[in-house]
């Protein structure tokens, strides 16, 4: 088989080290990415219905790109910020 082997991207692009420079812990990274991926997924689901309750991707996307990959790129580029809730 000639040619170049496929390059896996997924969680390796963007690299975890770059993402951890933007957020304060790996736990907040997981929470932010999961919440944003759910928002992006809901946005795409609502497009066909004409409802635009959520904000779409803030970065250029490729066809068939996963919402989690989009969310991780948004975090790396500093387009998302996390606000901590103060205990009452």
UniProtKB/Swiss-Prot annotation:
The protein, known as: DNA-directed RNA polymerase subunit omega
Reaction equation(s) it catalyzes: RNA(n) + a ribonucleoside 5'-triphosphate = RNA(n+1) + diphosphate
Subunit composition and interactions: The RNAP catalytic core consists of 2 alpha, 1 beta, 1 beta' and 1 omega subunit. When a sigma factor is associated with the core the holoenzyme is formed, which can initiate transcription.
The EC number(s) this enzyme carries: 2.7.7.6
HAMAP family named among the record's database cross-references: RNApol_bact_RpoZ
Record keyword Glycosyltransferase present: no
Record's keyword annotation contains Transferase: yes
Function: Promotes RNA polymerase assembly. Latches the N- and C-terminal regions of the beta' subunit thereby facilitating its interaction with the beta and alpha subunits.
GO BP annotation list: DNA-templated transcription
Class of the enzyme per the UniProt entry, highest EC level: transferase
Keyword line: DNA-directed RNA polymerase, Nucleotidyltransferase, Transcription, Transferase
Organism field: Thermobifida fusca (strain YX)
